[in-house]
Amino acid sequence: LKQIDLHKLSDFPKNKMGKILGYDNDYLKMPNKIIEMGLLPETIFRILYQAPFNGPMYVEFGEEKSRIALRKEEGEYIIVEELN
């Protein structure tokens, strides 16, 4: 069996490739914009930059290499795994 190392997007290391597995949406508090922006399960991503002082993270994702900024709190809802 393959061991999967789960992370939240907010804690994921910069410049490593990852895949979105799903969401931690207890109490249905996850912002709809996460899905509307295309951060869907099975999407491959990479964190390009993490602003200091818990500022936003800049994420590149998908085949078209879309880029967005997410607040750290928004990244708490997204469950990911690291790709080798």
Q: Predicted segment positions?
A:
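Compact, glycine-rich, soluble single-domain proteins
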Residues: 1-84
